[in-house]
Amino acid sequence: TLKNIKTACQAAEGLVKTKKIIKEYKPDIVIGCGGYVSGPAVYSAANLKIPTLIHEQNAFPGLTNKILSKAVDTICISFKGSEKYFKTKKKIVFTGNPVRENILEVSYEEARKKLNITKPCVLAFGGSLGAKKINDVMLGYVKNADESIHIIWGTGKRYYDEITESLKGIALPKNIEILPYIYDMDAAMSASDIVVSRAGAITLSEICAKGKAAVLIPSPYVANNHQEYNARALEKGGAAIIMTEGDITPDKLKTTINGLVNDKAKLENMKQCALKMSTADATSLIYEEIKKLTER
């Protein structure tokens, strides 16, 4: 079709342009993190015999990284099990996803003291913009939530007014905090026991790094349904419970959360499983792979 011809022409043009840029700047290494934009740059570098590395954040690799895997020197993966999607196994190194140092520096006890939390804590959010399905379910849940559980709910700025309007006239107890945006996510994540969220790669890496039990609602609106694969990896590791958009209701969420809070052994086991899946030193591991390639 005409569209396919146009795409092929754009890809060829991208290769020519990136090859020219790489020849001009002479980089020591070219790194790709997926996405079609990285394709021409990494492929051109590989053709010019410049060291190349790709980092796959998700459990299910994107198309660009799968194509590039044949040409690059090193493939860094973030989830154990992802190697089965690549044909060139000898290039694969398990590094995990880097997480922010700040989030690692705040302890559970310090964060709870800072936020004045004394009860089991649930942190719920759908990313910086919010997620409608998570908000719809949380809206029903907080109306009947147990007062023995502290709840921090980040709605996202675009949903906040609508949600506060829906709760008008309802006297929510002090244990429920509803915020348009969680500015101190380091403290909120550190102080929590259970996290209710989507299943983006970095979010899950932070959940594991902090050792939190997770109730995951993967977004069905992402490429290759990669959030479902990410969530399944944590579920398989014993760190998460998955509730799909088609299945979750406020009552089911309440039952799941109460079940974890009331079963301290299960909750603690999920936290420990999350910690076991963590690669808090991912940045160092990736750096070492870069160093190997640039020093060879």
PLM segments and residue spans:
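Short hydrophobic beta-strand element within catalytic cores of glycosyltransferases
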Residues: 197, 213-224
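Active-site-proximal region of nucleotide-activated glycan assembly enzymes
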Residues: 46-109
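A short, well-ordered alpha-helix in the C-terminal region of glycosyltransferases
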Residues: 266-280
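Acidic donor-binding loop of glycosyltransferase active sites
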Residues: 27-29, 190-205, 212-213
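C-terminal alpha-helical cap of glycosyltransferases
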Residues: 279-296
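An amphipathic, basic-hydrophobic alpha-helix
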Residues: 1-29
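Donor-nucleotide binding loops and adjacent catalytic segments primarily
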Residues: 108-195, 227-232, 236, 243-252
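An aromatic- and histidine-rich active-site surface loop
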Residues: 27-48
